[in-house]
Amino acid sequence: MATKTAQPSADNLGSRAPVEPCGYIYVYPKEGFPFKEASLLGNKNVGASAMSLPLLSDLTVESNFSFNVKAVHKKIDMTTLLVRVSAYHREAIVFFNTDLFEPIFVGPGLDILCSDARSLFGYTNFVPRTDLRDTVDIKDLYAPFYSEDSCFMAVVVTEGFKERLYFGNLVPIIAQGLKVQINGREAVKIPLYDEDLFSKSHEHLPRFYIPSVSKYLHDSVFTSIAQALRIRDVESVIRASEKQSIQDQYKLAKIVNSKDFSLQSVKCQDASAFMVIDCIAAELAMSYGLSFLEAPQDPCAVLDYTSWPIFETAETEEDRIKAIQDWNAMMSVHVYTHLFSTNSVLYLTKINKQTQSNKSEQNVYNTYFMQHGLAYAADATQRENGEPAFSGAPKFSGGTYTLYHLALASSFSPHLLARNCYYMQFCQHQKSTTNANYSVPQYVGTAAASDLCELCQGTCPASCIHTLFYRLKDRFPPVLGSQRRDPYVVTGVSGQYNDLDMLGNFATFREKEDEAVQNAESEKYTYWQLIQNVVEKLSTMGVTEGTVGSELITDIQSFLKTFRDIDNVVDSEVVKFMNCLVKNNINFRETIKTVHHVLHYCCNVFWQAPCAMFLNLFYKSVLAIIQDICLPIAMTYEQDNPSIGMMPSEWLKVHYQTIWTNFKSSCLDRGVLTGSEHKIVHTDMFCDFLNIDSALSGQIVPMKMQVRLAKALLTVPKTIKIKNRIVFSNSSMTETIQSGFIKSATKKDSYIVTGPYMKFLNSLHKVMFPNAKISALYLWHTFSQKKQLPVLPGISRENMVELANYVETSSKMHDDMNVLDIIPTTLLTYAKVRLNNTILRTCGQTQFYATTLQCLLPTLQTISATEYPHVLLDQSIMSVDHYLSSIKDKHALTVQTTLKEDIATVGKQRPIVTVPLVVNKYTGINGNTQIFQCGNLGYFMGRGVDRNLIPDSTGFRRQNNSSYMRRRHVFMTPMVAHLVKKNSNLNNLTFEVETIRKNVQNIFEDKDNLNIFDNVVLELVKGLGDSCENITEDDLQFYLGEYYIMSDEIWSRFQIITDSGAPWSVENVTKVLGCNKQEECKFEFVGVEEQLSCVPPQIEEFAPQATLSTLAASRKRKITSILSDIDL
């Protein structure tokens, strides 16, 4: 059936972007600038002549700065400008008076280390241009506005023109310098235009070329991109990127001639296909990935520096500095997770091919994959024509991680390496049992303080990178060359909406629109609404997020009441929920098998954390995922068009344009990457501009120009979907994997100790049994084994037996139905575990454990600095005793992770996320040959990543070691309440009377309760107190709502209470209502099929006729809605 393709809307960010220069040079006054705060956000290393700061409003740019622009490129004719839509690069590169900023890491010699590592692994070094004769003098930039010692300068540039900045092809117009206000300080911004805009008659254009700026871009930006594309010649990547952006060569292969291939891949059986697929992946990542990064995106609250919530309680400069340090410490978890993970995206070094397996039918679309392995980075390579490219690095002894590998992970950039070292200083070390001689004080006082160190010569032993590396050495991954297809770890920021509750996207009613049409009369009760209703009802009982029970439970009876009330709320809501599924014809037994946790990875570069290293991780993550998506497309195309006998460059000249066109329809909305195509227009016929040639000589002559867009259609990525399958699938799985999910059929004798109540029985043991001399563990373990209870003074036997019976019965029931490997630590978690276990049991899921998703949230801890020498900064150390005396009273800020927080709650706070991802590919059903993808959540590799990822070897549960396979983890750091304010929408505020009305109407829902009216009165008294004395019928109508027809019953009870003169309290009203309660009567109910004498005889004419048409009416309506357009 043919359908019309929806045309992209012209009302978008690109169309609304203003026409502006390619970038700006900012001249900032030194006075009043927060250098210490900015230094903590920057990436300056010791001795650097350039550094970067995040692009933030009211720190580096003005508050009304345009982050998306139509950047002017050149003139098509005398009256028409060619513009290119682009977002701004997220960094402001400081290049003048950088000495005003403090180094982020005080250890020296990082530039030497990075240069040596770059040469060791065969990557090209930066070579400054010598052919540019006419360059602008730095003095000419600041002299019209400030003196040399009173200012510093930085440059900002759009993504599409950063290559032009690197090569020195941008020209500043000093006469057009504009004064702007940046957080109350007056600064000047000077526009930068492309040299192509100027007349060819200008022989001496004052180009802006600063070697330190170009070197920064080469090392910190372009080397990272080259690594992601597996190319060692960084300069060739920059030239290719420039051609693509400036000459619109998106459909042409540009970097194939710069590719080199490992000798192992060249000598394999299908070497030509292997090389071609590698080249296709790199070319598509260049064409699509870099264009995605240039695309306009929505600016967000993260960019507003002055509105960061971390500063709300800061009163002094020291408070603000401490707030930034704490935030940096929380972010450090994500960085050192990458450095310590064997399968980090930083360690993706090649494209590999799976070997054929005879055990199961292998999915051919997953044949080629992104391979991690630091050992491959040292392999010798050759060009496509067989010429040697890289001779290989010497094999490192025993596969041990070295500082050169750390430099490789930092893209050989001393700036990124300094930032990584700063983050690692917050990391706690884990001593290996095989490292008996490990001693940080001994190392600092002896080896580090000697002149043998080639980086600091012993002058800075406490903060030298060698000392930091020694402290953390046992946590770094081994240098190996894996052959297995594993997930790779990526980092970014989560989207606004995620399905991270225990059953994820179950019962969202979003799957099929036709189901909604068929059952439009049935109310949709989604799983999300179920969770919200349970949470709201429990909150009225005092059970909220983090409630552990001590606030509600004071003795045995309150313990029983609290848990029974929670059980009643959960069970009643589950019954309503399951009934709704039945009414809506949802086959929940089949639907439950396909549910997933869904995490949305945001592709908006402006949402990324304000840090150069996180920007680097974002670039590498996006480029890796795009290459992963395109691998099966490249493989199938090469199979249809064999490359045997042709070099990759020759083959791509013929086929790349077709591949580029095909991939455009294959990358978006196929399961992983979502996005949209924007039609860019410029609504105004003319734009305000100036005579650019006369502006060079200082004369500003305004003029009107027409605008033509270089690209009218832009593909803008939105999110990357990462899914985690919840219910175990038994198909084609190995016994090892099954053993991690299958639930043991044998009954456990420790069902109470490992049950859902043990946490509360232990923490409230002294509250319920104040005179007990035995521990909670001994008491309940003895009871579960021998069915005996101790005789405790002050505790009645009846209460003790009632508690034991409840705990035993409920623990047994939990043990029978539990398929969630979660031990509740709060009352709300207990309720959610009971709720989801009940749903899973109703859906027939009792044989296998469900996969659980947990977040690793950073927590800060200040400890003694004895083993954290970096707090001494650049202090010299003479001996071990000198070190111990110097650090005696000092403390260090460190970070650890906790598993206590609910991932669904944290996922709503726009967290920074670090997740292991594997992209699986498959084809559609019913002969559909289109390739779809699914981004599945994977696992972290490496024992040093985090202590919470090390599987339990012992414990009460005595599980097998493969039980960790049913647990998935995500590192999360919330940005809401740190860099983004919480939503304070007044429409979301709840008044007290609303809560009272909701509680009252919830009571009416339990229509089987004989005392329903008494309970309503008690709820009103509980909420209103003495105000009940003045209650009116209008008030009752508000509180009762649709149940107002029952108001006479409520009103009569209020009259009784008023006449009694009792105070308006719950205790007194209970007594009054108890005294007036009538004796219970026994009622006899008769079925409607029995004819009663009082029922009038039925008139035959008015009786409904049961015909075949009425019995099948709903089915006919369903068929009619489907087949309405078919001529029968």
Swiss-Prot record:
SUPFAM superfamilies: Viral ssDNA binding protein. It is found in: Host nucleus. Belongs to the herpesviridae major DNA-binding protein family. A zinc finger (unnamed) spans 453-466. The gene is DBP. The keyword Cytoplasm does not apply. Keywords: DNA replication, DNA-binding, Host nucleus, Metal-binding, Zinc, Zinc-finger. This is Major DNA-binding protein. One of its GO terms (molecular function) is zinc ion binding. GO terms for biological process: DNA replication. Single-stranded DNA-binding protein required for DNA replication. Plays several crucial roles in viral infection. Participates in the opening of the viral DNA origin to initiate replication by interacting with the origin-binding protein. May disrupt loops, hairpins and other secondary structures present on ssDNA to reduce and eliminate pausing of viral DNA polymerase at specific sites during elongation. Promotes viral DNA recombination by performing strand-transfer, characterized by the ability to transfer a DNA strand from a linear duplex to a complementary single-stranded DNA circle. Can also catalyze the renaturation of complementary single strands. GO terms for cellular component: host cell nucleus. Residues 1098-1128 are annotated as: Required for nuclear localization. The keyword Zinc-finger applies.
